């Protein structure tokens, strides 16, 4: 889809970046000369702007050999960064997609700066193209032709084409993984059960040569996975514990464990959600989608790392056999849990998922979950809540998130918080000791299962979906944290290795 070339005959549509400068230079100047000074005139008259994210379409004379040029404003070069490059590309590719253009050429060198070298510019181009042109897969009865997609982008550059192609490959892998996560989250709950999610994981494993294990209900019963089994009690759909292993090293050591909450639909159980609160609960497997999206990116890029993916998956339904408030269950870890809120089910399945990941070699753990409404109240819909038991490992996760442009904010875990989750008179832990600090209580609960293993909890309840379209795509699922997890897996270094 993305091709690094030194010149291209595919110039019916061309994309050019414009920095805010006193005069045109480099490739932009060459375009101006080809247009016989027309670009300079358009800039003076304000019909074309170099201001950030401004996209201007110009229809050049036939002598130019192309039908249209998209100029995108990059702002001042001194302020231009990798993240800004992604935003600029997103705006222009969204315009191209809206115009239903299936092929375009991009003058990559007009997007390069001292802080954004060729490979990074190429990465930004490919990732943003895929994110910006993503469309929600709906189920409407249509008689019109299928939507036209961008099929080929010819990236014209005077730089090393192998280096540029490598950057395009990375960006494409990140864009594809994120879009796959989006598609999973957008799917209706009746079309994406735990069984369907397991089948998807098996297909991913076959494509990328991952080791795959799907634990069935009977196996969970033998192992004593009381958390996921309790949540599944009210459902007619069988639960699945989905396990994928990617081994990029000779030995199974220094393993990054990724645990994703896979609740395919959440009614709240007997602590039932309100009419407005229950709509959209198909997205309660956003953590699982993020982990699977990251695994797709990892499969494409093949880093020299070991990654373990664990997804406990079921729906949370109501029936005569469903779990009830006041029930006491025994988790895989052996710790007992008093159920005070059946709508606090995500932490129950994650407890078993975290324990299983530890048992199978995870050196560090990241769990990802649409876990609490409390995190939305605290941080809104742009920032993911984070908690940890290890600041050094948290910093690696935070660095990965910053590199990907995905905002996270750390919430505390105090000794008083730990006492609160242990306040049950009937069991080792309570799954919901109160509404105060609800997001923190949920994370603190999970920390009791991570124990001494370095661990970061990411609560994406506010960030997994967007109510409004952005330059990076339509309203709906965002695929948040898929890129962060993939970047973490690529960059991860065990602390003891750093000290050698």
UniProtKB/Swiss-Prot annotation:
Binds 2 manganese ions per subunit. Its EC number is 3.4.11.1, 3.4.11.10. It catalyses: Release of an N-terminal amino acid, Xaa-|-Yaa-, in which Xaa is preferably Leu, but may be other amino acids including Pro although not Arg or Lys, and Yaa may be Pro. Amino acid amides and methyl esters are also readily hydrolyzed, but rates on arylamides are exceedingly low; Release of an N-terminal amino acid, preferentially leucine, but not glutamic or aspartic acids. Keywords: Aminopeptidase, Cytoplasm, Hydrolase, Manganese, Metal-binding, Protease. One of its GO terms (molecular function) is metalloaminopeptidase activity. Mn(2+) 1 binds at residues 266, 343, 345. Its cofactor is Mn(2+). The active site is at residues 273, 347. Mn(2+) 2 binds at residues 261, 266, 284, 345. GO terms for biological process: proteolysis. It comes from the Bacteria. Belongs to the peptidase M17 family. This is Probable cytosol aminopeptidase. It comes from Bacillus subtilis (strain 168). The lineage of its organism: Bacteria, Bacillati, Bacillota, Bacilli, Bacillales. The gene is pepA.
């Amino acid at each position: 889809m993305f091709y690094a070339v030194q010149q291209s005959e595919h110039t019916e549509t061309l994309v050019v970046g414009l920095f805010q400068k006193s005069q045109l230079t480099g490739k932009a100047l060459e375009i101006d000369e080809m247009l016989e000074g027309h670009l300079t005139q358009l800039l003076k008259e304000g019909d074309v702007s170099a201001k950030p994210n401004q996209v201007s379409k110009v229809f050049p004379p036939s002598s130019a050999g192309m039908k249209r040029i998209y100029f995108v404003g990059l702002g001042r070069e001194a302020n231009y960064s990798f993240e800004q490059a992604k935003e600029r590309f997103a705006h222009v590719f969204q315009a191209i997609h809206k115009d239903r253009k299936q092929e375009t050429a991009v003058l990559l060198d007009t997007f390069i700066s001292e802080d954004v070298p060729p490979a990074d510019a190429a990465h930004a181009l490919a990732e943003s193209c895929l994110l910006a042109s993503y469309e929600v897969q709906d189920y409407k009865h249509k008689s019109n032709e299928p939507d036209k997609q961008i099929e080929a982008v010819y990236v014209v550059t005077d730089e090393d084409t192998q280096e540029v192609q490598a950057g395009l490959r990375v960006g494409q892998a990140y864009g594809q993984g994120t879009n796959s996560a989006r598609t999973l989250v957008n799917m209706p709950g009746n079309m994406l059960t735990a069984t369907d999610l397991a089948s998807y994981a098996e297909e991913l494993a076959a494509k990328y040569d991952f080791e795959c294990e799907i634990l069935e209900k009977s196996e969970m019963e033998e192992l004593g996975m009381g958390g996921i089994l309790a949540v599944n009690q009210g459902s007619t759909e069988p639960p699945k514990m989905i396990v994928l292993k990617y081994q990029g090293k000779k030995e199974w050591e220094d393993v990054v464990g990724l645990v994703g909450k896979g609740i395919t639909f959440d009614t709240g159980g007997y602590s039932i959600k309100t009419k407005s609160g229950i709509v959209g609960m198909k997205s309660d497997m956003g953590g699982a989608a993020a982990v699977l999206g990251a695994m797709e990116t990892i499969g494409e890029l093949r880093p020299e790392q070991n990654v373990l993916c664990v997804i406990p998956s079921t729906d949370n339904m109501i029936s005569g056999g469903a779990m009830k408030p006041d029930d006491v269950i025994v988790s895989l870890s052996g710790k007992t849990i008093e159920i005070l809120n059946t709508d606090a089910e995500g932490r129950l399945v994650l407890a078993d998922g975290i324990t299983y990941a530890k048992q199978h070699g995870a050196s560090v753990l990241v769990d990802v979950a649409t876990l609490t409404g409390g995190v939305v109240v605290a941080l809104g819909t742009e920032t993911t809540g984070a908690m940890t038991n290890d600041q050094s490992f948290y910093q690696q996760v935070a660095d990965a998130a910053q590199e990907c442009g995905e905002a996270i904010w750390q919430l505390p875990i105090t000794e008083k918080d730990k006492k609160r989750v242990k306040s049950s008179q009937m069991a080792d832990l309570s799954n919901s000791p109160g509404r105060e600090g609800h997001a923190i209580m949920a994370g603190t609960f999970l920390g009791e299962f991570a124990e001494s293993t370095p661990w970061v909890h990411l609560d994406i309840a506010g960030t997994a979906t967007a109510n409004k379209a952005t330059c990076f795509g339509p309203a709906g699922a965002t695929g948040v944290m898929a890129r962060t997890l993939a970047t973490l897996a690529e960059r991860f270094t065990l602390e003891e290795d750093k000290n050698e």
